[in-house]
Amino acid sequence: MEQFVLELAAPPAPTFASFVIGGNGPMLQALRHLADGELPHRAAYLWGGAGVGRTHLLHAAVAAAATAQRTACYIDAPVLESSTQLGADLIALDNAERLSAAGEQAIFEWFNRPGQRADSMLVAADRSPASLAARDDVRSRLASGIVFEVLPLSDDEKFAAMQAYASARSLPPLNEIFRYLLVHAGRDMGTLMALIEMLDRYTLSQKRPPTLPLVRQLLQQLRIANPLHGTDPV
C-alpha cells in the first residue's frame, strides 16, 4: 500500500483531454485555441474557487502549446519579479491574487510591449479581475482579453465522471465507494480520479475486489503520508 501512496504523489501530467468539462465547454475550446496561438485575443483569464481545476488547465495549456511547437512556461505569481521572465510564446501565470508589486509591473510591461506580437498569456486566480487587489492599470489589462469563471462540477457530474472513468478501466460498479469518496476524499476531480486509479492498481496487484474497508485503509495511509492536508488526501 505504501508504494502506491508514494506513486500518487506523481500523477500523470495534466492535459485538456483529462479535464472533466461539466459546464466549461466554451472555456475549454477557447483555451485550446489560445494554446495553439489561434485565439484572436492575446490574453485569457480564469477564475474560480479551490479544486475547480485552474492549475490543471494552466499546465494543460503549456503542454498543448509545446505540442504546437510553441515555447511555453508555467509561472507561480509570487515568483514573478521581472518582465524578462515573460519571454515564452505562452505564459501560464497561476495564483494572480498573490502578485507582488514587482509582479504587477512585469505584467504591465508585458501588455505594453511595442509592435504586433504573437505571444499570449493565460492567467488564473481565485477571484475575478475586478476583485484583485492590484493596480487599476493591471486589473484592466488582465480583463482586456477573454475572462472565464471555471464552474465547479455538481456532485452528480462528479459521480457520473467517476463512473465513466471506472467503466473505461473495466472496473465493476463502485457506486457505494464513489459516494464515500465524495464525502471523505476531497471534491476536486484530480484527487478523485487519482484515488480510483490507485485503487484499481492496488486491487489488481493484490487480486482483491475493491471494498469500502480497502478504501478507508487507502485514505488513512494518505493522511499519514500527507498530514498537513487534514481530511484531504492530496
Q: Where do the PLM segments sit?
A:
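Dynamic helix-loop-helix/coil hinge segments at AAA+ ATPase domain boundaries and subdomain interfaces
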Residues: 6-28
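Walker A/P-loop nucleotide-binding motif
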Residues: 39-57
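Conserved nucleotide-sensing/catalytic segment adjacent to the nucleotide-binding pocket
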Residues: 83-125
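Short regulatory helix/loop adjacent to the ATP-binding pocket of P-loop NTPases
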Residues: 129-143
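Conserved AAA+ ATPase "SRH/arginine-finger" region at the nucleotide-binding site
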Residues: 145-157
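Short conserved motifs of the RecA-like P-loop NTPase core
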Residues: 172-184
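The conserved phosphate-sensing helix
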Residues: 185-199
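Conserved C-terminal helix/linker of AAA+ ATPases
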Residues: 203-221
